[in-house]
């Protein structure tokens, strides 16, 4: 696995990755966790595996959202078509009564307003990029290198 190689090569240098950051934030606080990501990420089972390492009892519901990346890259950030597509992708996750939704792709925060509108305020959105930055800040603070 690529992460293992990076960790080995890094030695004592801390390594932060978005999957670990997103799973830490979700699996330590929630039991019913939704994950949306690209088909490749969903098929890899990376998020459910990582979540279950932290919280074996967690129920993880994953949904591939194949059209989100092309829509973001085409600039359909606040386009009505995005909302229609997002409703289709998110309905199965909403029906599972998840407590949080992990944005499992770095493109997805760009459409988080649309996602939040559809899932409602009762489902917490977890942006792994933000949690990775928080982890970096904690590491820098712990090593007294935060300036």
Residue ranges, per PLM feature:
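Non-catalytic structural scaffold of enzyme domains
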Residues: 1-147
């Amino acid at each position: 696995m690529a992460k293992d190689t990076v960790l080995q090569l890094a030695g004592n240098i801390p390594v932060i990755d978005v999957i670990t950051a997103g799973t830490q934030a979700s699996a330590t606080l929630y039991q019913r966790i939704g994950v949306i990501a690209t088909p490749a990420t969903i098929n890899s089972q990376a998020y459910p595996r990582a979540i279950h390492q932290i919280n074996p009892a967690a129920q993880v519901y994953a949904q591939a959202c194949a059209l989100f990346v092309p829509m973001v890259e085409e600039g359909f950030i606040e386009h009505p078509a995005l909302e229609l597509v997002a409703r289709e992708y998110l309905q199965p996750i909403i029906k599972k009564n998840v407590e949080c939704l992990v944005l499992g792709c770095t493109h997805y925060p760009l459409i988080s307003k649309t996602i939040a509108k559809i899932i409602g305020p009762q489902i917490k959105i977890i942006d792994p990029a933000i949690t990775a930055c928080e982890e970096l800040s904690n590491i820098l603070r712990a090593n007294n290198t935060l300036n």
